Amino acid sequence: MKFLTVAAAIFASTSLAVPTNNHNGGGACVPRPNPGNSNTSSAPGGNPTGGHTSSGPGTKPTGSHTSSGPATKPTDGNTSSGPGTKPTDGNTSSGIDCEVPRHAPTSGDDFKGICAAVGKQPLCCVIPVAGQDLLCQDITGGNSPSGQPTSVPGGQSTSVPGGNPTSIPGGQPTSVPGGQPTSVPGGHPTSAPTGHPTSVPGGQPTSVPGGNPTSVPGHHNPSPVGNDPSCCPSGLYSNPQCCAANVLGLADLDCSTPSQTFTTGDEFRNICATIGRQPMCCVLPVAGQAVLCEKPVGV
């Protein structure tokens, strides 16, 4: 009997030591939170429910968010580095998998929208070749590529083909074929093949066939010196080359500069023929390969 009395007393004392309410607000024994679910109260009156963290008196959060201060909102894990920012691929010299916009954009915003529709970004490039454009850069703001001007520090307005004049700091307006006259600082207007005059600083106008005469500073209309400019007119296709092969009309392989100057198209052809090549006018001769070439005028 005495043994049973002692055992009953031990049993009763053990039962009283185990809390029966995990949410009594003052207990020190807290259940292990389920994975992804945490109930923590750090001040009197806290009564967390579900997966919450409470850090102030009288708080009673509901749902599954964490409160860290007034008017805070949970985030979805996305990060932003500033208004209007977007990720980039870090490629500043060439665009990969490029294509011409489906239709001519009327503004910078329209350009962006056209490219965004196919999951791409707008770029201004030099030479599109087989899906890869060489030497690309971001478009300038939201201005129209064929209307509104953009300028560099101290310069005049800037535009792409068919748009407004472009200049370098302190210079006169500059344009590509079909645009307005172009010049270097202090010089006369310069243009690509459209008959507009071209000059160097202080010189007289220079033009392609059918335009005005050509000169250098301090001289008046001297005879042409060097290669015949009528074969490869100034502009995009202005580099005379002797090339061995042509690929799809876009790239000429194994090209080299003519070994001597020529004054006629026939001389240009004969110089190239002596090394088994054909005369071409190219845009960008690079390491023996000229990209985008065409046949010389009158050859």
Swiss-Prot record:
It is found in: Secreted; Secreted, Cell wall; Vacuole; Cytoplasmic vesicle. Keywords: Cell wall, Cytoplasmic vesicle, Disulfide bond, Glycoprotein, Secreted, Signal, Vacuole. Glycans are attached at N39, N78, N91. SUPFAM superfamilies: Hydrophobin II, HfbII. Disruption phenotype: Compromises aerial conidiation and submerged blastospore production. Does not affect radial growth and multiple stress responses. Its main location: secreted. Induction: Under normal conditions on SDAY medium (Sabouraud dextrose agar plus 1% yeast extract), hyd2C is up-regulated at transcriptional level during the first five days of incubation. Hyd1A is the most active at transcription level under normal culture conditions, followed by hyd1B, hyd1E, hyd2A and hyd2C in order. Gene3D superfamilies: Hydrophobin. InterPro entries: Cerato-ulmin_hydrophobin, Hydrophobin_sf. PROSITE patterns: PROKAR_LIPOPROTEIN. Aerial growth, conidiation, and dispersal of filamentous fungi in the environment rely upon a capability of their secreting small amphipathic proteins called hydrophobins (HPBs) with low sequence identity. Class I can self-assemble into an outermost layer of rodlet bundles on aerial cell surfaces, conferring cellular hydrophobicity that supports fungal growth, development and dispersal; whereas Class II form highly ordered films at water-air interfaces through intermolecular interactions but contribute nothing to the rodlet structure. Belongs to the cerato-ulmin hydrophobin family. This is Class II hydrophobin C. It comes from Beauveria bassiana (strain ARSEF 2860). The lineage of its organism: Eukaryota, Fungi, Dikarya, Ascomycota, Pezizomycotina.
